[in-house]
């Protein structure tokens, strides 16, 4: 049995939520697990927010006690942030955005700060608008930049 409802409680440790179903006189479900893309060797974690509109699959028993939250759905209040079938897009509450356009092959990350841990290789040209700060040497094909003189 498929139902729609609104998340009213979130348990971050167990990745479960409670959902209120307006079409059932405001009945609130038991704690329901949220379906995730991966949970074993690779793991994904992203819980719905309190107040988020979700779809729930309940067991056929009709008790509304055992079921799973399948995901959130857009509605008149919470509308899609983009309207383009070629884009993968995530916007966080603080304004951070991650966007990939499979038609233009452009990955865009908009954030106050981006931290990359590990080695980074850039193949292609690099344009920097702003200052560059390095705590170590900057090496180019012509030699070691910190020891360069004019």
What positions do the PLM features span?
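Low-complexity, small-hydrophobic/phenylalanine-enriched stretches
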Residues: 100, 104-116, 120-122, 126-128, ...
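Histidine-centered metal-binding segments
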Residues: 146-150
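Exposed beta-strand/loop interface patches that mediate assembly or binding
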Residues: 1-102
């Amino acid at each position: 049995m498929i139902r729609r409802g609104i998340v009213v409680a979130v348990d971050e440790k167990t990745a479960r939520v409670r959902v209120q179903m307006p079409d059932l006189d405001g009945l609130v479900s038991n704690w329901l697990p949220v379906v995730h893309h991966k949970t074993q060797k690779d793991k994904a974690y992203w819980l719905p927010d309190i107040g988020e509109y979700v779809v729930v699959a309940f067991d056929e028993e009709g008790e509304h006690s055992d079921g799973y939250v399948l995901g959130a759905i857009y509605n008149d209040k919470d509308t899609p942030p983009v309207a383009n079938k070629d884009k993968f897009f995530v916007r966080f509450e603080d304004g951070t955005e991650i966007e990939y356009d499979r038609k233009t092959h452009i990955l865009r990350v908009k954030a106050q700060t981006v931290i990359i841990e590990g080695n980074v290789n850039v193949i292609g040209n690099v344009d920097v608008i702003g200052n560059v700060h390095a705590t170590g040497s900057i090496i180019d094909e012509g030699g070691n930049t910190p020891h360069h003189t004019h």
